[in-house]
């Protein structure tokens, strides 16, 4: 009692304490970063290696495998996947959450160095690594377009000047430049002209290499001067290479221009990028795993004017895509929802108390509690994100509860004629333990969440801590500031009611009287109530088993990502046409604002598209509805598929796939994997629970298989190395020399003229110069025929792997899809040599599903322990926890009604309900125990009186929590798909629990009291103290 008096009789100190809490909160708010969600990105590092012209199988065996063996020894690697395609290998390392990415990067570099001696000697450069997840959607895409400069020149500006500068910005993990390649001098050889002149392709390569040399020449000195020797040993442009003498034939000089077309072009002509039907170079910027997306985007935007000045005026630098506007809009929506919740909660208090003076007290307590929380959030390193702001929105109903309980009890004493300061002291003393019990038991709900590991635990930690801190500050405020304000502001008389509110007051009295009559009937028919309670428990179990489940609500971030997958034998020219066709279909959709895309590189039959939708207030459809509409139009394009998915703020794993969810097949037997993957993929494609089923296994690419006659080769004086060198020189875009410029290095690329690379009969024109100097046609010692070959080889760990990706059709959940996949695998009878498992987000969903029930049980057990300690009783906590089944039924039925799957957000709602609905029982049990202890009442009389006395605060606290959550249900706009499941769960649970627990709690209280007396050694002791 002295504790309460200390604050009630020292108003200045109490006010200054509250002001200090508020000022600290304001300061913390100003320094908090902004993010869409808590930081939950796994540390991911991508290792890249190249060997131009090498087949996917060669890259997998000679490059990927040695690197994987070395990288696999690094501590903390949770997953390692690789993909090898034509001339390129990419290895993705995903680390444990607690692994520092900078330390991991050092280990990766050491592992690359250790594997260097095992890698092919012909690699043009050492493997490199980047601290970014390639499967993440870019946080920003910049485009370069120009009517004056070529694509190669634009690419040079982008990769040489812009990308390095952007990479140095804090938070940027990777800048991927696409749409073309670096400028180069391209030598397109004419096989027939070479044959006529008796010049081999190796002769041309050697001549070019020897003619472009950058070596130190030394210096000359005499007694007084020193001269540096400089020669014209370098050739820079196509015009300088054109007259190069490469051979003499019958005394005549054969120049390069006689046997080849020499042009200033690009290193790889099989690349294309576009933005809104215009050729463009794309800079796709990804953030570091630990970086804040908003701060990173703001830093890039601040740098753009400076970047624009570094490139010519004829080049247009534009932002094609920016993830931050929808994130900011979503957070603004949550902030508005928070303000509405506060207003509704205060309105509830005003309606019940019917006094403006009394309403001011919780109207002050709520903002002090919420604002003070920002200081703790800053100290904990949190951010202002959708989850932390939703925690504050929900906290609105909680923090006002404590103030309501104290205020209502003090007001009751004032109405009885007690003096204000005495009423404040007495009222606070009576409910101080109740408020403490409610707050501690509510915080106890979140202890299992704080101990939960993995991504779900990291995701929910900010929510749990933010809400717990708000409740803790609310507890302090309700026991200090609230009674002080009551003692000094309220008067010892009944509050004056406005005429408009008298009707509401009479309605409350009528409700209370009606409740009293119905409660008397219930207490005389306890068995019926017991059956209802058991029925809610059974219904809970059935609803939880049957309700569709998913990991995280499907977000509408305003950004779509699309993966193009064409026939495996498609040419680059045809693939570029498919990209243009798909872009036109999407660009014509009224909901689309911007489209960028690219194709080419090592994966000739694939491409990527990034689509920015119009703001939510300018379109009526959600992202998923737009995808459903576009899917019908895109399906009409022959020979290729475009798979669209909405970009999410959470994406798990480093696999680049064409859909949101993945199912990976593993095998140590590559032949078995290639046999069963098509069967499984075709089966999954028929399932109605899945959409956009596709696979990264591509083993039906067109190949021209050459078979050497080694005996003939030996007789003709030709070795295999010479024959392979011929093919590489002719068709491998071989980089044969380097051009050194002040800002960059460029290549001289040699191959046969494009008209020959696009014609199979060009092999007939190929020849090799044997050891006698004679030109021997390729057809003399080799035969060729079309065959199938893999376009990519994929590994997970050191096993061969194939990942099947899929999206969810409208109305289907991830639990439906996972169950259907498990049934399909069983029906197919897949052998044990082929193992299937969910990957990425689907894998985390499986793990979360397995732990959900355990988490709920742990939360209930924690609350029971806390209540047992507070009440020094094994029985009364069970009475209080009997309120939970009805809340669970209401929450699950509400989700079913709104056709919302049970997600991680809904799980938060269930956890919150465990803390919310027991408050009613705590208020009843506390007053019943007090009445038995000091009023000499029977248990039935005590609980009946407690129910009637606490009816008004129970209704106030429940409606305050309900109205605090209601704006989440009704909210629209950006981010509403995250807020609504939480609001639906809480509102549904509160409505059902309020209808039932007002009756079930008294019955359970009497049941346990009789049970306690039956087993008690001291039957006369009626109250457990």
Swiss-Prot record:
It is a multi-pass membrane protein. InterPro entries: AcrB_DN_DC_subdom, Acrflvin-R, Multidrug-R_MdtC. The chain crosses the membrane at residues 3-23, 333-353, 360-380, 387-407, 431-451, 463-483, 528-548, 853-873, 875-895, 897-917, 953-973, 984-1004. Keywords: Cell inner membrane, Cell membrane, Membrane, Transmembrane, Transmembrane helix, Transport. Induction: The mdtABC operon is transcriptionally activated by BaeR. One of its GO terms (cellular component) is plasma membrane. Belongs to the resistance-nodulation-cell division (RND) (TC 2.A.6) family. MdtC subfamily. The MdtABC tripartite complex confers resistance against novobiocin and deoxycholate. This is Multidrug resistance protein MdtC. The gene is mdtC.
């Amino acid at each position: 009692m002295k504790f309460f008096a200390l604050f009630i009789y020292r108003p200045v100190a109490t006010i200054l304490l509250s002001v200090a809490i508020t000022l600290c909160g304001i300061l913390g708010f100003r320094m908090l970063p902004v993010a869409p969600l808590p930081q939950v990105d796994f540390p991911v590092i991508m290792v890249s290696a190249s060997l131009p012209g090498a087949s996917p199988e060669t890259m997998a065996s000679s490059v990927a495998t040695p690197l994987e063996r070395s990288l696999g020894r690094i501590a903390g690697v949770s997953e390692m996947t690789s993909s090898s395609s034509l001339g390129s290998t990419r290895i993705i390392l995903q680390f444990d959450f607690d692994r520092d990415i900078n330390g991991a990067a050092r280990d990766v570099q050491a592992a690359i160095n250790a594997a260097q001696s095992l890698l092919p000697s012909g690699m043009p450069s050492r493997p490199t690594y980047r601290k970014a997840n390639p499967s993440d959607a870019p946080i920003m895409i910049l485009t370069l377009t120009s009517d004056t400069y070529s694509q190669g020149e634009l690419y040079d500006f982008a990769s040489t000047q812009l990308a390095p500068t952007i990479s140095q910005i804090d938070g940027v993990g990777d800048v991927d430049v696409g749409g073309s390649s670096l400028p180069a001098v391209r030598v397109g050889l004419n096989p027939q002209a070479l044959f006529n002149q008796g010049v081999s392709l190796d002769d041309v390569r050697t001549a070019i290499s020897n003619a472009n040399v950058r070596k130190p020449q030394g210096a000359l000195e005499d007694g007084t001067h020193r001269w540096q020797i400089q020669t014209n040993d370098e050739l820079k442009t196509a015009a300088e290479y054109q007259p190069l003498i490469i051979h003499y034939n019958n005394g005549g000089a054969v120049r390069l221009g006689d046997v080849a077309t020499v042009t200033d072009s690009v290193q790889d002509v099989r690349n294309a990028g576009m933005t809104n039907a215009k050729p463009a170079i794309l800079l796709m910027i990804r953030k570091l795993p630990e970086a804040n997306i908003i701060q990173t985007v703001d830093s890039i935007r601040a740098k753009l004017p400076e970047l624009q000045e570094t490139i010519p005026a004829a080049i247009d630098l534009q932002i094609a895509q920016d993830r931050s506007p929808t994130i900011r809009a979503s957070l603004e929506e949550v902030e508005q929802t928070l303000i509405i919740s506060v207003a509704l909660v205060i309105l509830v208090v005003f309606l019940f108390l019917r006094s403006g003076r009394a309403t001011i007290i919780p109207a002050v307590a709520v903002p002090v509690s919420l604002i003070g929380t920002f200081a703790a959030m800053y100290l904990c390193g949190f951010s202002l994100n959708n989850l932390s702001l939703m925690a504050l929105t929900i906290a609105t109903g909680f923090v006002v509860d404590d103030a309501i309980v104290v205020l209502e009890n003090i007001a009751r004493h004032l109405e009885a004629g007690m003096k204000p300061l005495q009423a404040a002291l007495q009222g606070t003393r009576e409910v101080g333990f109740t408020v403490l019990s409610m707050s501690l038991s509510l915080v106890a709900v979140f202890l299992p969440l704080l101990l939960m590991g993995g991504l779900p635990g990291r995701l929910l930690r900010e929510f749990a801590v933010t809400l717990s801190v708000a409740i803790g500050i609310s507890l302090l405020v309700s026991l200090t500031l609230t009674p002080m304000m009551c003692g000094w502001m309220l008067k010892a008389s009944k509050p004056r009611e406005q005429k408009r509110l008298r009707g509401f007051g009479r309605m409350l009295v009528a409700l209370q009287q009606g409740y009293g009559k119905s409660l008397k009937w219930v207490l005389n028919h306890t068995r019926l109530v017991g059956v209802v309670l058991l029925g809610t428990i059974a219904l809970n179990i059935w609803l939880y088993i049957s309700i569709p489940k998913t990991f995280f609500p499907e977000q509408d971030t305003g950004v779509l990502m699309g993966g193009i997958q064409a026939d495996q034998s498609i040419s680059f020219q045809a693939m570029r046409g498919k990209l243009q066709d798909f872009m036109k279909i999407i660009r014509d959709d009224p909901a689309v604002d911007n489209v960028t895309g690219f194709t080419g590189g090592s994966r000739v039959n694939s491409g990527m598209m990034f689509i920015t939708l119009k703001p939510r207030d300018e379109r009526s459809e959600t992202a998923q509805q737009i995808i459903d509409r576009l899917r019908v139009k895109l399906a009409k394009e022959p020979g290729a598929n475009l798979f669209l998915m909405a970009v999410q703020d959470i994406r798990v794993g480093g696999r680049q796939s064409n859909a949101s969810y993945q199912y990976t097949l593993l095998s140590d037997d590559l032949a078995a994997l290639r046999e069963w993957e098509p069967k499984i993929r075709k089966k999954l494609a028929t399932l109605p629970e899945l959409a956009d089923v596709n696979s990264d296994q591509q083993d039906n690419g067109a190949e021209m298989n050459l078979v050497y006659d080694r005996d003939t080769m030996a007789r003709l004086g030709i070795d295999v190395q010479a024959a392979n060198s011929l093919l590489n020189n002719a068709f491998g875009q071989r980089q044969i020399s380097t051009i050194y410029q002040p800002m960059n290095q460029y290549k001289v690329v040699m191959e046969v003229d494009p008209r020959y690379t696009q014609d199979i009969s060009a092999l007939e024109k190929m020849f090799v110069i044997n050891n006698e100097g004679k030109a021997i046609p390729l057809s003399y010692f080799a035969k060729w025929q079309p065959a199938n070959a893999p376009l990519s080889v994929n590994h997970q760990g050191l096993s061969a792997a194939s990942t099947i990706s899929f999206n969810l059709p409208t109305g289907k959940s991830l639990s439906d899809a996972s169950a259907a996949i498990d049934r399909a695998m069983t029906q197919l009878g897949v052998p044990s040599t082929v193992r299937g498992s969910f990957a990425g987000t689907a894998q985390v969903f499986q793990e979360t599903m397995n732990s959900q029930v355990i988490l709920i049980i742990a939360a209930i057990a924690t609350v029971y322990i806390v209540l047992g300690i507070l009440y020094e009783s094994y029985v009364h906590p069970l009475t209080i926890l009997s309120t939970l089944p009805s809340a669970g039924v209401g929450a699950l039925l509400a989700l079913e009604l709104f056709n919302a799957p049970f997600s991680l957000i809904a799980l938060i709602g269930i956890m919150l309900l465990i803390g919310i609905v027991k408050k009613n029982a705590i208020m009843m049990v506390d007053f019943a125990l007090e009445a038995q202890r000091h009023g000499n009442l029977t248990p039935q009389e005590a609980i009946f009186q407690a129910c009637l006395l606490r009816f008004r605060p129970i209704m106030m606290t429940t409606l305050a929590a309900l109205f605090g959550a209601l704006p989440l249900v009704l909210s629209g706009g950006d981010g509403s798909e995250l807020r609504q499941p939480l609001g639906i769960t809480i509102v549904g649970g509160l409505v059902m629990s309020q209808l039932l627990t007002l009756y079930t709690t008294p019955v359970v209280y009497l049941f346990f009291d009789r049970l306690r007396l039956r087993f008690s050694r001291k039957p006369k002791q009626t109250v457990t103290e």
